[in-house]
């Protein structure tokens, strides 16, 4: 436990605390998705006025172009699916039971990795991925036209700023989830029309500024320079 005293203030204040956890129990995928819990309590005059609980899963991982994914130093073959947040009759407005059922079906299939496409999904889904040890690719809704000829990038200041803001919000909101191992920056963009390459580079730089610990990735359906901007 650590205490920090913050003076009353009208502006946002940032505080950092560090501690050492000897011999930590690692979050180890579906084999052992162990998590600690961090609790931040705001006290005033000895009374609790607010409290935030965040997951804390400790793990390390690497990727290799030839050998694949390694979790906590051990090779982990990834058996994954791509999931849209949508059910019949409710559309995108899912209840917790829908997320739970999707997770149950994935575990029944032997899934240990997921791409949550093509947008940030419900906070509860990330919690389920943490608890069940499923390696997760989370991404922003920067999506090309798929099989159509039209462009997916509109080179306007408002478009650019909106995408960057969504990226920052995604990373900051979900940074503490141990299941998230990749930040996805785009899906199947085309280079015809407004060329997105320079903007993707800006997003890639921003992602690493916000989170130097996780690699970036993308999904592409064409060849060329667009495939060599993100880390994976």
Regions found by a protein language model. Give the residues of each.
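Aromatic- and acidic-residue-enriched carbohydrate-binding clefts of CAZyme catalytic domains
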Residues: 79-84, 92, 137-175, 182-184
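Phenylalanine-focused residue identity feature
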Residues: 19, 34, 61, 69-70, ...
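Active-site neighborhood of glycoside hydrolase catalytic domains
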Residues: 131, 156-230
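Active-site-adjacent beta->alpha loops and helix N-cap segments on the catalytic face
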Residues: 122-125
């Amino acid at each position: 436990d650590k205490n920090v005293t913050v003076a009353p203030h009208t502006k946002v204040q940032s505080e950092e605390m560090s501690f050492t956890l000897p011999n930590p129990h690692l979050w180890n995928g579906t084999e052992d998705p162990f998590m600690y819990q961090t609790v931040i309590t705001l006290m005033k005059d000895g009374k609790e006025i607010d409290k935030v609980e965040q997951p804390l899963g400790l793990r390390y991982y690497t990727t290799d172009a030839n050998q694949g994914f390694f979790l906590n130093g051990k090779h982990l073959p990834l058996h994954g699916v791509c999931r849209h947040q949508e059910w019949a009759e409710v559309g995108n407005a899912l209840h917790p039971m829908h997320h739970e059922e999707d997770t149950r079906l994935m575990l029944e299939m032997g899934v240990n990795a997921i791409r949550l496409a093509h947008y940030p999904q419900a906070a509860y889904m990330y919690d389920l991925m943490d608890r069940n040890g499923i390696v997760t690719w989370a991404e922003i809704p920067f999506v090309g036209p798929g099989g159509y000829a039209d462009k997916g990038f509109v080179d306007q200041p408002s478009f650019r700023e909106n995408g960057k803001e969504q990226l920052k919000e995604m990373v900051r909101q979900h940074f503490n989830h141990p299941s998230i191992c990749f930040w996805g920056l785009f899906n199947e963009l085309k280079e015809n029309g407004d060329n997105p390459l320079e903007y993707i580079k800006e997003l890639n730089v921003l992602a690493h500024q916000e989170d130097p610990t996780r690699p970036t990735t993308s999904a592409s359906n064409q060849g060329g320079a667009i495939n060599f901007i993100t880390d994976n």
